[in-house]
């Protein structure tokens, strides 16, 4: 033991990886730890000793993978996010190929906007586009709070994944309120957020309500 350094407890056994014919790696679920809470990723999150530096990548499930491009061919982005089996498969693809230390749930931050009754689509090369931006109290009134069962496709996908991932943790994410509000106000991506700033300073109560 190194003087002045706390004793480290043994970490979980290394992952079991097997090479496939196409050169990718297969992760054996459950080989790395007793469960997700004992994984290298969550150990590192808790600042506990780990057997190796855990690795995962931003956008690890996506256009860089040929299997992703094949699966998504002809399927609009928002539609793919609302198909539980497809969400699960896309989420699992980089785990199978690279043996990363965590899976990232395949989704998009604008799904809640779709659920509250807005006309919304993701245009290639542009991003989320809202048909009718929210810029007045009357606009705000037409929005509604979705029922939980209207988002059941997310729950179903998570259930599939937790059954398939074994000891590999699943990372979820969500859009911050300001980000989602700016999409609603601007009607899409913006460089200067002029409409958002105008509401923030000109109608602060409306902005807070939104």
Model-identified regions with their sequence ranges:
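Active-site-proximal, glycine-rich beta->alpha crossover segments in alpha/beta enzymes
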Residues: 121-210
């Amino acid at each position: 033991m190194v003087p002045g350094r706390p004793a480290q407890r043994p970490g979980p056994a290394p992952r079991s990886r097997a090479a496939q014919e196409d050169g990718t790696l297969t992760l054996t679920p459950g080989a790395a730890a007793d469960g997700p809470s004992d994984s290298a990723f969550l150990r590192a999150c808790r600042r506990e000793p780990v057997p190796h530096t855990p690795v995962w990548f931003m956008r690890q499930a996506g256009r860089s993978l040929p299997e992703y491009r094949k699966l998504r061919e002809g399927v609009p982005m928002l539609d793919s996010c609302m198909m539980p089996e497809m969400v699960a498969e896309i989420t699992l693809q980089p785990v199978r190929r690279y043996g990363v230390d965590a899976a990232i749930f395949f989704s998009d931050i604008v799904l809640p906007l779709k659920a509250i009754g807005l006309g919304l689509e993701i245009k290639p090369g542009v991003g989320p586009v809202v048909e009718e931006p929210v810029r007045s109290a009357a606009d705000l009134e037409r929005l509604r709070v979705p029922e939980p069962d209207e988002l059941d496709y997310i729950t179903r996908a998570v259930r599939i994944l937790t059954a398939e991932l074994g000891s590999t943790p699943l990372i979820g994410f969500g859009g911050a309120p300001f980000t989602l509000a700016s999409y609603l106000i601007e009607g899409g991506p913006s460089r200067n957020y002029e409409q958002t700033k105008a509401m923030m300073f000109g109608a602060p109560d409306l902005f807070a309500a939104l």
